[in-house]
A protein has these predicted regions:
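Short, surface-exposed beta-strand/strand-loop-strand elements in extracellular ectodomains
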Residues: 59-67, 190-198, 395-410
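Edge beta-strands of jelly-roll/beta-sandwich modules across compartments, strongly enriched
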Residues: 98-109, 233-241, 306-320
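Short beta-strands within extracellular/lumenal beta-sheet-rich domains
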Residues: 31-42, 163-173, 281-286, 364-378
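Aromatic-lined ligand-binding clefts that engage carbohydrates, nucleic acids, or primary amines
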Residues: 48-63, 92, 172-195, 202-203, ...
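Carbohydrate-binding surfaces of carbohydrate-active enzymes
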Residues: 1-156, 214, 226, 230-232, ...
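Exposed aromatic-hydrophobic patches
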Residues: 78-85, 210-216, 283-289, 374
Length: 413
């Protein structure tokens, strides 16, 4: 049980930027950790408004006057938060954590923090929409090295502060040392340090709920543990286990993209393109006969090269009229006929998660055809696509014959 806490808002350093434009982690010479962006509301908004962050890499939390409002999770393709009534002088904070970096492939250029802009959208009395871009940002740098965590100002844990975002510190004594697993299920999201060593990251969503603690980094007598929790714990308590917990998934909301009883109806629809993909590994590019415009794009997989009843896609990009990749940040999966979420995290949004090693997969035994529908959030001109099958040798279950449908209106079910 932890007896000391260093609340986030009591331990903000001096701002590295006192006023200016939004900057990324790279602009601020930050490789990892968190940035807190702060600005002051200049115009009152009576009633509901929407805060849109373009783009938040990777996990952002929104606060007004220190009160938590909502989160923007890049993994879930989120970009907006519904805001309460805002008054002139209200302080808006956006607390952004960098989750990790990709060191290979085209996705290596992946800046962290808020990479473009922040806007407030609200409705006037005549029902017209107004977008305000927020400017003049303070930026606070919060590195994640042990020294920064140890130097924070700690205070005793009590009923009021035991669930706040920040650092939790405790000491414990050992008569004998050995390997163990630290159970982090009662904490939210963050990192663990033991005796000055960074042990690893945790996130309550799982499936991994424990961190491996090497016995060589423990010592007889007194040991120190610091937990940085960017979302706050349910209870500041951990325990050591003999065995790891690596299969306890706690996702929010539905994991799949097909409602109960929902079946795609393509009768009467005409494909804008049909073709055959090559077998084997590596990216493939397909160009349509002519560009088309629409919001929803459906890929219908008719079979696979391995002649089995399921298919896989690792990554998918759509190309504009100039052959350039369209931004995938506003994308969401409108529908997938089948997703394997039992043998692994292989749901349909893996086709645009920037991870070439993950993939969408249907379940074994579910017959073709298979369908995935991408919602691009607004009409776009699409002239083709780039597709990457699984990375394993031979690209198992890669799509062979396919059709593509594009519409401005949602497909029928």
């Amino acid at each position: 049980e932890f007896n000391e806490v260093a609340p986030l808002y009591s331990n903000l350093p001096e701002p590295s930027q006192k006023s200016g434009p939004l900057k990324t982690f790279e602009d601020m010479d930050m490789g990892w950790g968190c940035l807190l962006y702060r600005t002051t509301i200049q115009q009152a908004i009576d009633g509901e408004s929407i805060l849109k962050v373009t783009e938040a890499h990777d996990y952002a939390q929104v606060f007004v006057n220190g009160r938590y409002i909502g989160k923007i999770d890049r993994i879930r393709r989120e970009s907006t938060v519904h805001m309460p009534t805002l008054h002139v002088g209200d302080v808006l904070d956006i607390y952004v954590e960098a989750l990790g970096r990709i060191n290979f492939g085209r996705a290596i250029k992946d800046f962290k923090g808020i990479t473009e802009k922040v806007e407030l959208r609200y409705t006037l009395s005549d029902n017209s929409l107004v977008d305000i871009e927020l400017r003049d940002w303070q930026i606070f740098c919060l590195p994640d090295d042990y020294r920064a965590q140890a130097q924070m100002k700690y205070e005793p844990v009590n009923e009021k502060n035991q669930g706040v975002r920040g650092n939790y510190r405790a000491t414990f004594r050992l008569n004998k040392v050995g390997d163990t697993f630290i159970n982090m299920e009662k904490f939210g999201k963050g990192q663990v340090y033991v005796n000055g060593h960074a042990i690893g990251r945790f996130w309550q969503i799982g499936p991994q709920q424990t961190l491996y603690m090497p016995g060589c980094w423990l010592r007889k007598g007194e040991n120190e543990i610091i937990v940085t929790d960017v979302t706050g714990p349910r209870e500041p308590v951990i325990e050591g286990l003999r065995q790891p917990v690596i299969d306890r998934l706690k996702l929010e909301g539905p994991q799949t993209h097909r409602l109960q009883g929902q079946t795609l109806d393509l009768s009467g629809e005409q494909p804008i393109h049909a073709g055959t993909l090559k077998s084997g590994n590596g990216w493939q590019e397909v160009r349509f006969d002519k560009p088309v415009s629409g919001r929803y794009l459906c890929i219908e997989a008719l079979n696979s090269h391995w002649n089995r009843e399921y298919c896989c896609i690792s990554e998918l990009y759509l190309l504009d009229g100039n052959g350039k990749r369209l931004s995938r940040e506003p994308w969401s999966v409108a529908y997938a006929d089948d997703e394997d979420v039992t043998t692994g995290n292989k749901n349909a949004d893996k086709v645009f998660d920037l991870q070439e090693s993950t993939f969408w997969s249907t379940n074994r035994g579910v017959p073709f055809p298979h369908h995935i529908i991408i919602d691009m959030s607004q009409d776009q001109t699409v002239a083709g696509f780039q597709i990457l099958p699984r990375m394993e040798e031979g690209a198992p279950e890669s799509i062979k014959d396919y059709k593509v449908y594009v519409k401005s209106e949602p497909f029928r079910y």
